[in-house]
């Protein structure tokens, strides 16, 4: 997961969040205009006279009148929709109120669409960040929350049931609640302030609901008034969803498992090759292992499961069409959500780039840091650029340090994910370690409510599945009860993935998932909050990011002292020496040797604190050109991907020249705010 840092005002190609004013307007369709023809311009040869038509009959007159009314209605309706859409845009200037503030807050949006929040108390800054996220990204927040809670079907209908079942099975909401419970009080206060800012704005009625809410018949104002539009636990859950999106390989494990019934191990590793120059991680004959266990479905079972899957897919496809008799046109986003869900567990080909250059190797004498994200395109953008400023907390907020941090935020999270403060800059790319393992769980033939667990040699032992029933509300249909089973390893994916029954005999075996990110001690959110206050690369990587859990990231950092550093931050499991599968394919869950044995200590994950680093490839320091932002003079040049180039022949002085040119251009433009807003607590 990575992104460009704070965009420079001098760069016209800055990758930033779409300005609210640039939201696409509804198209208009003016009537065709034909040029007038003067009688003198007509041809001299007149056409034969035509008989005059009879006066229109009653039905025809009625039809013409109705068409005129309908046509006018369409024009009026289109005008009403356009006016409503404009009314739903946020008010970005003037005065507004926000419940819960201890003092006034200033919000300024600059020409690069970076939102600057200046508060007198830290929690007010976080509350204001929640407000501006709600102002500009209300539907994005609402949709994200429905995804992680598995409530899409409530508004989109049965087409989204597979996604809801998968998310409910993973237990994202339950894991988020457990992780929230383990956070320290000051972190909980920040998450609460952020959620309060979102809910207060949505409940205020300061702007009309965006069209998505109207199309789906949703009432976010009432939900926000109860504090339920966004909760502190939702921020923890959204961090989990990012870990799910960027850190998984269960799909690849299942693909190897499925392929092993048709090809031998040598061919299997040709289909799923290891890293170049490396041997396969496991030498186990997977085909022989799974045949000996008898896990695969018979042809009859596979055909039956495939037929059921095809019927379900056809139903979902039909429900997803733009057909008013079957579903709402607004259900079109579900197709992309289903594609996203189908792609979970496959991270090959995903990646990013970051570079950091020590001050001693740059012409300016200051370090350079660039971050190039390789995340999918979306509308609205996944990132929201912001700067949060506040002195240290006073009175009831005395536990909170001051803020001056700038960079890319994620709507739903109350901190800068990638960016810089007055002392240090940082960037991420995805490390992609193996933090997910699938386990074959054998079902007790005498009691299907039990599964096999490790036992002394020569003995067999069983344990009960942990179960819970999830009720999924479905638009236009009765509620669906979904039973979630879990083993000592984790949730049973086979209960939510129809493809499993097409490959394996699910009456005798199921697949359970062990995923590091679901553990209750996942405090990635805490790392993000504490990173904003780091004063050096050592504090960032050695203190704040010790809390970082999932998804593991290659973190590069630079500070005002000229130091640069790299650290693989995150939690990676250790496996026993006799674990011959090494996590590449589903393992027999009743054999203890396949269980995780612990975690790689944070001090032992890869790191470096010297020289010039590049996460994709080593390069000469002079190959990076940077545009520095005049907004914060930290001595650390934070480079946006759009303004960074790599050319081997580039002279060493190019970086300083580019900085000088960028600074001059920014001064010429004046770094003027495009919108100013003053927020205060209601009287």
Name each model-derived stretch.
Residues 2-59:
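N-terminal Lys/Arg-rich, disordered targeting/topogenic segments
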Residues 54-72:
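N-terminal Sec-pathway targeting helices
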Residues 67, 75-368, 373, 379, ...:
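Substrate-recognition/specificity elements adjacent to catalytic centers across diverse enzyme folds
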Residues 118, 126-127, 238-240, 365-366, ...:
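Short helix/loop capping segments that flank catalytic or ligand/cofactor-binding pockets
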Residues 177-184, 368, 520-530, 683:
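Glycine- and acidic
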Residues 398-480, 531, 590:
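Compact, glycine/acidic-enriched structural inserts
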Residues 436, 493, 547-683:
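Hydrophobic alpha-helical segments
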Residues 524-546:
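Alpha/propeptide regions of enzymes that mature by internal proteolysis
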